[in-house]
């Protein structure tokens, strides 16, 4: 079984180095490692050239983009390139995700044991930066419920006590996708920039085959803890807009109309309770809802990296 790796990086060279090392140390080696460099300015480009020049049994591929396309644009480019490469499964991850050394070995054994099953993807346990605490927010089950609601509950700690459990929503942290399924539906929504690109993609993949979480596959996610008091920043726009766009694309209109009321209400409550610069938060949420109704995606002309209420 041939496994490829797609990593997207932007200005986190120290973490990228750790990530690359974690793939090269796998007990079952990947066929290739493809790194999408989202126009980093911290020496990433130069380091990757040096990394590539040190030849190993693993093929090393670099895709340097001429602008920062966000995580969604980076994963789109990476997965698009993976379709032309020699692998059967593609592992996707951010540059701050470090799989344990036996992650690919466990994945390979599971896939070979269940080769008669219709699998779209498998994924593992995401651990917080302490290496022991499970971050349940990376796996979820999405379904419709009463009163035209869309429920998207995260996985629960008890789920990880099982040998496996089925989901239909994953993050691009510690996920391995069946390449055959990648060819049967659109790739990542590249115009999302950040947030919900992985959820939207995984939900479509779940319509083509099972998505299974295998807790013994473990990935440490070296991501900082976000304080609720920091909710009012540029990323909030994309979280609200893309949540609604995902619903608009994948569910009936009645659900979209209901969620255009429910989703902004929940976020406005969060801004009211925890956020600073509340008026900017409310305005950003309203702008996100308006654009979702128009089907407008892409990088917003105001809410983009570097924006803050005080600028």
Residue ranges and their predicted role:
Residues 87-96:
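Short beta-strand-to-loop acidic/aromatic patch adjacent to the donor-nucleotide binding site
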Residues 169-177, 181-187, 191-217:
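A short, conserved alpha-helix in the catalytic core of glycosyltransferases
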Residues 102-137:
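Conserved donor NDP-sugar-binding/catalytic core segment of glycosyltransferases
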Residues 234-242, 254-311:
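Non-catalytic, C-terminal membrane-associated alpha-helical segments of glycosyltransferases
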Residues 22, 37-46, 67, 97:
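A conserved acidic beta->alpha catalytic loop
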Residues 64-85:
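Glycine-rich, basic loop-to-helix element that forms the pyrophosphate-binding segment
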Residues 21-31:
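Short, acidic, metal-binding catalytic loop of nucleotide-sugar glycosyltransferases
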Residues 142-168:
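Short, flexible, basic/aromatic active-site loop/helix in glycosyltransferases
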């Amino acid at each position: 079984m041939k496994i490829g790796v797609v990593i997207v990086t932007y200005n986190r060279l120290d973490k990228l180095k750790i990530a690359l090392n974690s793939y090269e140390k796998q007990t079952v080696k990947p066929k290739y490692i493809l790194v999408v460099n989202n126009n980093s300015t911290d020496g990433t480009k130069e380091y990757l050239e040096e990394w590539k020049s040190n030849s190993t049994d693993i093929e090393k591929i670099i895709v340097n983009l001429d602008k920062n396309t966000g995580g969604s644009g980076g994963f789109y480019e990476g997965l698009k390139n993976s379709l032309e490469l020699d692998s059967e499964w593609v592992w996707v991850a951010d540059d701050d995700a470090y799989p344990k050394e036996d992650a690919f070995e466990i994945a390979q054994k599971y896939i070979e044991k269940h080769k008669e099953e219709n699998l779209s993807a498998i994924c593992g346990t995401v651990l917080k930066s302490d290496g022991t605490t499970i971050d349940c927010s990376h796996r979820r089950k999405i379904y419709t419920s009463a009163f035209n609601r869309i429920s998207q509950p995260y996985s629960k700690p008890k789920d990880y006590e099982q040998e496996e459990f089925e989901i239909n929503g994953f993050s691009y942290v510690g996920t391995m996708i069946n390449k055959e399924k990648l060819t049967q539906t659109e790739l990542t929504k590249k115009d999302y920039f950040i947030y919900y690109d992985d959820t939207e993609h995984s939900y479509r993949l779940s319509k083509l085959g099972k998505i299974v979480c295998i807790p013994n596959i473990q990935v440490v996610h070296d991501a900082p803890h976000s304080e609720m008091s920091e909710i009012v920043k540029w990323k909030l726009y994309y979280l609200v807009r893309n949540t609604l766009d995902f619903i608009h694309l994948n569910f009936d209109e009645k659900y979209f109309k209901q969620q255009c009321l429910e989703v902004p209400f929940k976020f406005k409550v969060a801004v009211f309770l925890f956020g600073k610069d509340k008026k900017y938060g409310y305005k950003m949420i309203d702008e996100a809802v308006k654009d979702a109704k128009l089907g407008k995606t892409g990088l917003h002309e105001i809410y983009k990296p570097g924006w803050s209420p005080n600028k």
